[in-house]
Amino acid sequence: MLSATPLYGNVHSWMNSERVRMCGTSEDRKIPVNDGDASKARLELREETPLSHSVVDTSGAHRIDGLAALSMDRTGLIREGLRVPGNIVYSGLCGLGSEKGREATPSSLSGLGFSSERNPEMQFKPNTPETVEASAVSGKPPNGFSAIYKTPPGIQKSAVATAESLGLDRPASDKQSPLNINGASYLRLPWVNPYMEGATPAIYPFLDSPNKYSLNMYKALLPQQSYGLAQPLYSPVCTSGERFLYLPPPHYVNPHIPSSLASPMRLSTPSASAAIPPLVHCSDKSLPWKMGVNPGNPVDSHSYPHIQNSKQPRVTSAKAVNSGLPGDTALLLPPSPRPSARVHLPTQPAAETYSEFHKHYPRISTSPSVTLTKPYMTANSEFSTSRLSNGKYPKALDGGDCAQSMPGHTRKTTVQDRKDGGSPPLLEKQTVTKDVTDKPLDLSSKVVDADASKGDHMKKMAPTVLVHSRAASGLVLSGSEIPKETLSPPGNGCSIYRSEIISTAPSSWVVPGPSPNEENNGKSLSLKNKALDWAIPQQRSSSCPRMGGTDAVVTNVSGSVSSSGRPASASPAPNANANADGTKTSRSSVDTTPSVIQHVGQPSSTPAKHGGSTSSKGAKANPEPSFKASENGLPPTSIFLSPNEAFRSPAIPYPRSYLPYAAPEGIALSPLSLHGKGPVYPHPVLLPNGSLFPGHLAPKPGLPYGLHTSRPEFVTYQDALGLGMVHPMLIPHTPIEITKEEKPERRSRSHERARYEDPTLRSRFSEMLEASSTKLHPEVPTDKNLKPNSSWNQGKTGVKSDKLVYVDLLREEADTKTDAGAPKAGLVAENVGQDTEATKPSADPVIQQRREFISLREELGRITDFHESFTFKQASSQPVFSLGKDSGAAGTNKENLGVQVATPFLETALGSEGPAVTFGKTQEDPKPFCVGGAPPNMDVTPAYTKEGTDEAESNDGKVLKPKPSKLAKRIANSAGYVGDRFKCVTTELYADSSQLSREQRALQMEGLQEDSILCLPAAYCERAMMRFSELEMKEREGSHPATKDSEVCKFSPADWERLKGNQEKKPKSVTLEEAIADQNDSERCEYSTGNKHDLFEAPEDKDLPVEKYFLERPPVSEPPSDQGVVDTPHSPTLRLDRKRKLSGDSTHTETAVEELAEDPLKAKRRRISKDDWPEREMTNSSSNHLEDPHCNELTNLKVCIELTGLHPKKQRHLLHLRERWEQQVSAAESKPGRQSRKEVAQAVQPEVTSQGTNITEEKPGRKKAEAKGNRGWSEESLKSCDNEQGLPVLSGSPPMKSLSSTNASGKKQTQPSCTPASRLPAKQQKIKESQKTDVLCTGEDEDCQAASPLQKYTDNIEKPSGKRLCKTKHLIPQESRRSLQITGDYYVENTDTKMTVRRFRKRPEPSSDYDLSPPAKQEPKPFDRLQQLLPATQATQLPRSNSPQETTQSRPMPPEARRLIVNKNAGETLLQRAARLGYEEVVLYCLENKVCDVNHRDNAGYCALHEACARGWLNIVRHLLEYGADVNCSAQDGTRPLHDAVENDHLEIVRLLLSYGADPTLATYSGRTIMKMTHSELMEKFLTDYLNDLQGRSEDDTSGAWEFYGSSVCEPDDESGYDVLANPPGPEDPDEEEDTYSDLFEFEFAESSLLPCYNIQVSVAQGPRNWLLLSDVLKKLKMSSRIFRSNFPNLEIVTIAEAEFYRQVSTSLLFSCPKDLEAFNPESKELLDLVEFTNELQTLLGSSVEWLHPSDTGHENYW
C-alpha cells in the first residue's frame, strides 16, 4: 500500500487553520450565493444526519469555510440519499457516525486497505486480506505490493487519511451507506482526519466547529466513488517522520499514471501545506457555496474549483473533489496556510496525537494529499474516465481530476505524477483482483493497498500513487461496485454510479473558489490555459516536488493562480480541461501526469491534446454553465481527503472512476522521476511549457511513468490518456454530466462552442494542444491534440483501461447527465475537453494501457470478467475484439467498447444507469449533432477533426498500428467517445465520430438509467457493444490495421463500390450525414451493442450490430443529409472522410461523424469481404452466436443495442430484436453492415427525433419487422435503393436479409436498452435505417421501417423474405405516410422535415414491397422501433408490449395484410378490406402506421367504419373510432355507420356508435331512418327508448320510462341480503323454545313518552342489562320508593354510583339519548337506584309490546 500518509498528511495540513486561510475557505468567507445555493440545494445536507463531529447546516455548508469543511468529520457527511450539488446524488454517501463511520471505514477500507478514522493506527486495515492496515502495520504490501509506503510514524497517523477520511471506507464496503459509500454512513471529508475530528480547535481551527461545517456537505460533495483513493496509497505506514508517498514502479499497472509525488517524494511541510488540496474540502467544496469560498479568494478558487460552478453542484462537487484531493492543489493555493491545512487534510488516522497529526500534515500534506487525491479523483467527476479506465485511467483520472481541480493543482500534480507513475494501476488491479466484488468503494483503498504492496514502485511512482488510487478505484470496484456501476464496469463506480457519485461531473477546474460565475469559469478556462502556461513551469517542478514534497513553487503558483481567483480558474483551466478532459486527462495522466492534473478541471490547453482540447472546450463551456469544466455535473473538485478520511466516491464502483484531485494551476508539475518509470510528467496544465510533459519530455516523453514497451516511442497527451495517464472516463464523464445537467443539446453545443467556437479558448486550446501535443505528440499539431484525443482514444480503446475508462464515463456520464441539471452548463466546456481528452487517452491506452490494463485487466478481470476479457484483454491481446470487418465501426464501437465493456461489468450492478447515462447524452447531443446541432457540431468538429484526425491518424499509426491499433483506437475512441459523448454532438463531433457515438451511448445509457428497465441488460448490451467494437476493431486491425482504407477494405469490393457510389452520389450530404448518422449510430450501436451483448450475452450481437452499423452507416449518413445535417456539416463530413482515411480503425477516434459516415461503408465492405473473419471474431468474442451469422448478428445486435440496447423502455423492441437477431443469426453474413447501419440510423434517428421517438420508434419497429419480413427481395431492392441514395449497400444477399431479420429481432431485443435515452438518436437511426434498409425511402421509409420493422419482422417470419407485398402495396405508401406523419412529423419537429419528406418520397419509390420487404433496413427498423418503443414502453421484454404505442408507433404488418386483396379499382384500401373481413391486426397495423386514412372512402363513399359496422366487427369499430373515424361518415347514398349497424342488427355496435356521438336522427338520402331499419324487437325497443330519452316524453307517458333496478335485482329471492329481523340481536333464553323469542323483534309502544332505558352492567357476574332509573319509574307511577318496593318486590332494584352509571351509559352503543345524560354528573359519587326493565314493568308503565316474527306478521299486544 502506498503510504497515504504523505498525501493525507497534506490533506490534513490542508485542513488546518492556516490552510484554511490559504484556501480562502475561512468560515467567515462566503461562497458566492449562486454557487452556494445551487450546491446547497443539491447537497441538501441533512442535519439529522448523525454526524459525530460536525453536521453542516445546509446554509452553513454553503458558507462553510474550505478548511472548516475539511475539518468536518466524515461522519458529518451528507446523509445517504443526499444529493450533492449539481444534482449529484451520492447514494453511496452514507451518514456515518463518527464511530460508525470509522467502523465502516475499516470494513470498507478492507479492500482499500484503509482503517476508519476512529482507528488511525488501523488506517490501512481493510476487511480483505489486502487491508492496508496490514500493509501499514506490517509494512508488507497487503495486496502483494511490496513496499507499503511507510510514512514517518507521525505522517502515518496524521498524514494518512483513514479510509473514512478518504471516504474509502464507505466506498470500500458500500454496505453502510445506501449511497454506496462503503463503511461510512457519512462521507468523511478526505481531509478530515479522525484525529482531526478529535483534534482540538486550537490545532485545527477549522476543525474546531466541524458540526458547523458539516463535513457531511463536503463529504457528499466529495466523490465517494473514488475507490481508487485507496487510503493505503496514503497509508501512514510511517507513523512519524517525514511522509513519503511511494508509488509502485512503473512496471506496475499504472506506471504511466504517476502520483504527483516523486518516487519516495518527500513532501516538505510547506509543500504539503501548499499542496493541501482545497478540493478536499472541495469535494464538498465542489459546492463552492459550501466551502464559503469567495470569488475574490484565489485560494478558494483553487481549492474549490467547483465553487465557481455553483450551478453545477455536481460539477462543483467533482471539482471540489478534485481540488480537495490533491494536496498539491492546496499547495498551489496559499502556501503557508495550505501546507498546514493540507497536511491536516490528509489527517492520518494513524496519527496518535493531533499534534503528531498536525505535525505530519505540513510534511506529508502534499504526498498524502496527492495520494488521497488519486482515490478521491476516483470519486470525482473524472470517475467517468476513471470508470472506463477501470484502474489505469481511473488512476490517471484520479490524479488528473484531483490535479485538475482548481483547488489542488498541487494535488493535481500529485495525481498526475501518480498517473505518470502508472504503478498504481497495477496495484489497483491487484486490489481489484482481491476485492473486486465486495469492495466497490474499497477499490480506492485497494488501489492504495496495491500501491502499498508496490511500495517500491509507489516510491518510484509517487505520482502514480494517485493514479493507483484511481486504478484501484477503477478496479477495486469490480465486486460490489460493479453492480453499482454495471453500466460502466471498468470505471470506478464513482462516475457511473450516480447514487454514489459525489462528483460525477469531472470536476471542472472551476477552482477559482471565489467566483462561481460562468464567465469566470470561462475565464478560468482560458486562464487555466494561461495558468498552465505560466504556472506550468512551477507546476512541473512543483509537481514532483509537490508530490514529493516540493510545494513551495506549487504553492506560489497556486497562490498566484488562486489569488486572482481567475488564476485559480486558470489553474483549473487545466483542471477544467481535465474535467472536461477528465477522461483524457486521466489517461494522459496515466500516460503523462500533466494530463491527469489538468483533466479534473476544465480541459486545459496544456494537457497535451486532451488538455488543450478540453481546455478550450472547457474554457468556453465553462463560461456557459457555472463551470463547464465540471460537465459531469461534478465539479472537477479533487477531493483532498486525509488518509483518515478515505473519501471515495460512492458512485464510482468502477475502479476507473476516480475522484479527481484538483491541483492549483499554479502548481508546477515537474517530471517526476518515478523509479523504474523514468520521468513522470505532471499534468500539462501544471507543466511550465503548458504541455503535458515537461519541457525535456515535451516532444516525446517516453512515458517515463511506465509506458509499456508496446507503447509508441513517444507519449503525447493523448498517449498519456491512452496510457491511462488521463483517465478517459474522467474526461468523457464530464460531457455526459453536462448532458444530464444541462440540456444535452446545449451541452453538445456548449462543448462545441466552448471548445471550438470560442476563439480564445480555441486558440488557447490550440496553443495548449500544440504545446502539449508538441510535448506529447511532437508530430501532432494542436488540432492533433483533439484528434489524437479521438485517435488515441481509439487506440486506447484497444487498451482495456481505456474501455473501462469510458465505460465508467458512460456510467458516470449517465450519472452526471442525470444529475448534471445544475452543473450541465458548467459541465459543457469540460465535457468537450474531457471528451476530447477521453478520446486521446483512448489511443494511448492501447499502448500503455495494454500493459497497464493487462495488469489492470487482471485486476479488473477480478472486477469484471467482461472487462477483463474485453477491455483489458483487448488491450493486451485485442484478438477477441479485433474484428477486422467491424473495425470501421470499431472507432465508434471502440469508444463504445471502452464505455460499454467497462459499463457492462459495472452496469450489472448499476443496471441501466450507465447506459442511461450514455443514452441521455446521446439523446441530447446526437440531437444537436444529427439535427440542429449536427451541422454546427460538424462544422466545429471538422476543423479539429480534420487536423485532429490526421494527427489522430498519426498517433493511431504510431501507437495503435503496431498492435490492435485500430481496435485500440476504436476502443479508445469508444472510451473517448463515452467521455466525449456529451460534446460529441457538439464539439465532440469534431474531435471524434466515436465521440458522438459515445455521446449517443451516453444518452442511451442515460435513458437506460432513467428507464432502469435494461439496467443489467443495458449494461450487458453496452458491454456487448463495447466487445463488439473491440472485435470490430480487432477485425479492422487484423485486416486493415489503422489504415485509412481499412474501413474501405473491410467492405467487400461490391459493397465498397456501392458505398462509394452512394457516397459519391451524395458526396457531402451523404458523407456528412453518414458521418453524423453513423456517428450517432456508431455511438448508439456501440453502446447499444454493449448493452445488447449483456442483455443477450451475445458478443456476436454486438459485433453483428456493429457490422450492421457499418453496413448501414453509409445509408445512415445519407439519411442525415436528408435530415439537413448533411448540408451543414459537409466539410465535417469531408473531414470525417479524411479522418476515416487517416485512421481506418481510429475512425471514431478521429471523427465520430466521419467514422460513422465511412465506417458503415467500410464495415459493409469489410463485412462483405471479411464477413467470415468478423464472424469468426464475433464468434470468438460472442460465444452465443453462430460464427457465420455471428458477424451479422453482432452487427445487427450491435446496431440494435446501439439503437435499442440503450433504450430500456422498449422491451417489445428488445424482444423483436432478439427474435430478429435469432433470425439474423442464420442470415447474419450478408447484411450485418447494412443492418448495423440501419440500426445505426435508428440509433441516430432516435437521437435526432428524441421527441417523436415514441411514434417514430413504434413505426420503425413495425417497418423493421416489415422490412425484415421482406428482407430477401427487399435486400435487392435495398441494394439498388442504397446505391441510388448513395447508401453503401451490402451485396444485399438473402443471408443479409435473414441476418437483418435476425438482427432486427436482436435489435428489438436490444433496442430497449438504448431506446429510452436515444429517442432523438433513434429517429436519426431510423432515418439512417430507412436509408440503410429502404435506401429510397430516406425519410419516410425509415419511418415506415420504424413502423414496419415489427411488421417486417413478422412478415419475415411468416412471409418469404423475397416475396413481394403486392397486395399490401397500397399499404406501403400509407405506411410510409404514417411513418412520415409519426416519425416524419417528428423529424420536422427536429428540423428533419426535409429528411422526413424526402424519406417519404423515397419510401414510395421502393414501393410497398421495398418498404415492407427490405430486410436489411427492416432489421435496423425493428431495432429502431425497439429503440423507439423501448423509450415509450420501457418494456424490455415485450417487443410488442406497447399496444398503446402500437397505436402511435409502427406495428409490424400482419401477414394477412399481404394476403388481403384490395380492390383498388373500387377505391378500396387495405384498411377497408381488413375492416370488412375482420382482420383486426391488419386494421391496427393500418391505423397505427397510418397506412390508410381511417376515413378513406371508396368509390361508393363507404369508409372502413361502414364496413366494420355492417359486419359487426365490434373491436374493429372501436379501433377505428379510437383512431378518429368519423362516426357520422356518410356514404354517397347518405348511409351512416349507424345505419349499417342497425340494418344488420348489431346492437352493441349501435351502442358504441351512439356513445361516440353518432346521430340517431339522421336518415339516409332516401329518407330511411334508423327506426325503419330495425329488424329485431330488441333493437327497436332500444332505439325507441334512446330516442325517447333524447326527445323527451310526456309526463303521463310511462311506456317509455326506463326502469332502474338495484343490485338486488341480480340476486335470487332466496339469496337476498341479510334479514335484520331473521335473527334479531339480544339474549336468548335457552329454556324457551327456539322460535319463541329467537326470531322475534320487539317493539314497545306507549301513549306517553317512553322512559329512557339504560344498558348497564351492574355486576361482574352478569352482563349488561336494560335498566330504568327508579326515580323515573316512581315519577311515572306516582308512588314512593318504599311503596314501589313493597308492591313490586319481584322487580330487581340495584344501586350504582352516578359516576359509574354515567360512564357506562355514555359509552354504551345502545344509548341514543345523550340529552338524558346532561342531568348526571360524571364525577359525582352519589348512588343511583336502578330498576330492571322487564315486561312486567313495561306493562306497569302502560307500554304495549309487540313482537314481530319474520314469518308471522300478526302481533300480540301485552298489557
UniProtKB/Swiss-Prot annotation:
ANK repeats mapped onto the chain: 1466-1499, 1500-1529, 1533-1562
Function: Transcriptional corepressor. May specifically inhibit gene expression when recruited to promoter regions by sequence-specific DNA-binding proteins such as BCL6 and MLLT3. This repression may be mediated at least in part by histone deacetylase activities which can associate with this corepressor. Involved in the repression of TFAP2A; impairs binding of BCL6 and KDM2B to TFAP2A promoter regions.
Species of origin: Mus musculus
Stretches with biased composition (Low complexity): 552-580, 1426-1439
Modified residues (N6-acetyllysine): 392
Example GO BP: chromatin remodeling
Annotated spans, Disordered: 100-120, 399-432, 540-635, 739-795, 1079-1190, 1222-1334, 1397-1456, 1612-1635
Positions with biased composition (Basic and acidic residues): 739-767, 776-786, 1081-1111, 1169-1178, 1256-1282
Designated name of the protein: BCL-6 corepressor
Subunit structure: Interacts with CPNE4 (via VWFA domain). Isoform 1 may interact with MLLT3/AF9. Interacts with BCL6; the interaction is direct. Forms ternary complexes with BCL6 and SMRT/NCOR2 on selected target genes promoters; potently repress expression. Can interact with HDAC1, HDAC3 and HDAC5. Interacts with PCGF1; the interaction is direct. Interacts with KDM2B. Component of an approximately 800 kDa repressive BCOR complex at least composed of BCOR, RYBP, PCGF1, RING1, RNF2/RING2, KDM2B and SKP1.
Region (Necessary and sufficient for interaction with PCGF1): 1638-1752
Keyword Transmembrane: no
